[in-house]
């Protein structure tokens, strides 16, 4: 017997509750976008991607038999002098039976389509994963456990735990075009390109350039909120926010250089990669409460393990050696260099060098203004380009498994 409360019910779907923050970028028609971020060619007319492993992005929610699909080429353009100009292609992943090529079976030949499958995948089956509605869901960050695309491609770094208020460009570090497997990552760090600290410093600079300006009032609020929720604003020293650095007790992290530079020190961002999130700290720590005269004291003991085969293992060890109980010290490469003997001697009438002839300054010619800039892109092209960065000469950064995680800069 039907209940009287059922009166007025309909079969209409429940309204979608959208998360806060700005809308994510749209790709193609609404509701038909890839679940994953794109890989981007480094140069125009690059060949189609080849993968070290299966080429299927990591997705722990799917069984092995469902891990198959295709990468589809997406042409890109940007406005420029004299009209729109092509930029290197982007490639998006879709599961078999979904997306723009949903009518194709796995392996069917078509221009701009590259089929991929994990070992043990049932390529005769069709996926029920569907596609992404950009108004409701963010792109999922790309990760390849068995090896990514070849060196002709790259992708922008997106932290795994980012919120909807942070777009992919919030931590855009031009992330690795080939994240190494654990076997291949051992002992391969070399050159300034692989320096974790330098790259972390670059991320901070990029964030400050692209991010919104922090007002003095906002900076003051960041530095003086409840102690456990404070963050260091740009231009602040560490001890201005968290008190003087000490040895052997709480507040023992940071040498004099880090204290002076605050978040400008790239080592800060590097170490934030190892700091637990709020949830990890609460549910993964040994929590010890203790009543004291001034209130309830909560102690959180958490251990982060950096595997020895992590590509940045040596850098993390180096930072810890410098910064744990580091008050009163500075990195060796930051110590002031002694003046040379010739420059330290006072100049005399006989030994003073002859004055240098000053070069005539060249007159700066005014730059020619662009007379014609065609910004007319079609609506589809604007949607396709909305999420993409146009880096003329992107630097490949190999973060591997130790990519910068969630931070609160």
UniProtKB/Swiss-Prot annotation:
Domain CoV N CTD: 215-331
Official protein name in the record: Nucleoprotein
UniProt region (Disordered), positions on chain: 1-32, 44-69, 121-194, 238-259, 326-409
Cysteines engaged in disulfide bonds, as pairs: 320-323
Major localization class: virion
Keyword Endoplasmic reticulum: no
Top-level lineage group: Viruses
Organism: Avian infectious bronchitis virus (strain SAIB20) (IBV)
Biased composition (Basic and acidic residues): 180-192, 247-259, 368-384
Family the entry assigns: Belongs to the gammacoronavirus nucleocapsid protein family.
Pfam families, per database record: CoV_nucleocap
GO MF annotation list: RNA binding
Location of the region described as Dimerization in the Swiss-Prot/TrEMBL record: 226-333
PROSITE patterns assigned: COV_N_CTD, COV_N_NTD
The protein's role, per its UniProt record: Packages the positive strand viral genome RNA into a helical ribonucleocapsid (RNP) and plays a fundamental role during virion assembly through its interactions with the viral genome and membrane protein M. Plays an important role in enhancing the efficiency of subgenomic viral RNA transcription as well as viral replication.
Ranges annotated as biased composition (Low complexity): 162-179, 341-356
Location in or out of the cell: Virion; Host endoplasmic reticulum-Golgi intermediate compartment; Host Golgi apparatus
PTM (free text): ADP-ribosylated. The ADP-ribosylation is retained in the virion during infection. Phosphorylated on serine and threonine residues.
Stretches for region RNA-binding: 29-160
Domain CoV N NTD positions: 31-156
Stretches with biased composition (Basic residues): 358-367
Record text on subunit structure and interactions: Homooligomer. Both monomeric and oligomeric forms interact with RNA. Interacts with protein M. Interacts with NSP3; this interaction serves to tether the genome to the newly translated replicase-transcriptase complex at a very early stage of infection.
Keyword annotations of the record: ADP-ribosylation, Disulfide bond, Host Golgi apparatus, Phosphoprotein, Ribonucleoprotein, RNA-binding, Transcription, Transcription regulation, Viral nucleoprotein, Virion
Modified residues (Phosphoserine): 190, 192, 379
Modified residues (Phosphothreonine): 378
